[in-house]
C-alpha cells in the first residue's frame, strides 16, 4: 500500500510502498478515504515534543474510511462500516483514569500517528473498541477534522463548566478555533472571538460570534471586560504565549481558563489574583470515546461544519510547509484516491 512515511525527524516525508497492516485479535482494517492534517502531525514529523514518536512513522490521527476486514473477537464493527481512527488509539482499560472516565489520561495509552502508525496511508488498522462510528449522513472529508480538532474543542468547552447563556472567549480562530466557535454556539453559549487579523474576525462573525476582536487593533482584555464584564470561561487554542496570558486576564471572578494550544512557553499565573478571584486553570487534551460520540452527533445534526481544503497524499510535504508558515485557513484533509 502507499503511505507517507517519516523516516527521519525534520526531513521530508517519503511517499512509498509499505506492507499492508496485518490484523491481530480485536482489530479492524480500514481503507482510508480521507485523513485530516493536524499540527500534531507536524510535531511528530519534526520530533520536537518531549516524548518522541516512533520511527519510521506513518502520521495521521484523523483517518476516516471503510472497514474491509475484521479480526477474531470483533463484535461491534462489521465490514462496510465507516469509522474514524482518532488520536486515542487505545488505552489500558484498567488504570484509575480509564475506570473513572478519564481514558485520555491513561499512562499506557497508544496514540494514532504517533506511537503507532496512522492514517497517512491507503490502509490503517486499529482496535475495534476504539474506532469511532461515523454517522451515515457525514462526508468523510468534512468529518475527518472532528476526530481531533472537533472533539478537542468540544471537550475543552465541556470542562470549562460554562453554561448556556454565559460568555466564553475563544482565543485563536484558526483550525481549532473556528470549530470551537461553532460548538460553543451550538451549546447555547455567547462567544467572544479573538484573533489578530480582520479576516479571522470576519470569519468569526460569519460563524456566529457575538463579538469579534482583532487583538492587534485593541486590547482584548479591556474590550472583554468593558463589553461583557469578563467571560465565564476562556479557551485558548492559539500557539503564542501572549494569547494565553490575555485569555487568563479575560476571565471574570469564579471563571475558568482552559488551555488547549501548545506553544513552546510557560504560562505565568499571578497566584494572588488566582486565589482572590477564584479562577480555575485547566488543561484539556482531545476527548474520550463518549466525548467523540457527542462531538460527532453535533456534526451529524448540522450544528458544526469544519472549513476544509483537500490535498492529495503526495502533497503532504507542501501542506506541512504551508502549515509552518501559517498559510492555512481552516483544516486541510488528505483525500485518498479510490482504486
Swiss-Prot record:
Pfam families: ADH_N, ADH_zinc_N. Zn(2+) 1 binds at residues 38, 61, 148. Its cofactor is Zn(2+). The rate-limiting step is NADH release. Catabolite repression. CDD domains: CAD3. Zn(2+) 2 binds at residues 92, 95, 98, 106. InterPro entries: ADH-like_C, ADH-like_N, ADH_Zn_CS, GroES-like_sf, NAD(P)-bd_dom_sf, PKS_ER. One of its GO terms (molecular function) is zinc ion binding. It catalyses: a primary alcohol + NAD(+) = an aldehyde + NADH + H(+); a secondary alcohol + NAD(+) = a ketone + NADH + H(+). Its EC number is 1.1.1.1. Binds 2 Zn(2+) ions per subunit. It comes from the Bacteria. Keywords: Metal-binding, NAD, Oxidoreductase, Zinc. Active with primary alcohols, including methanol. This is Alcohol dehydrogenase. It comes from Geobacillus stearothermophilus.
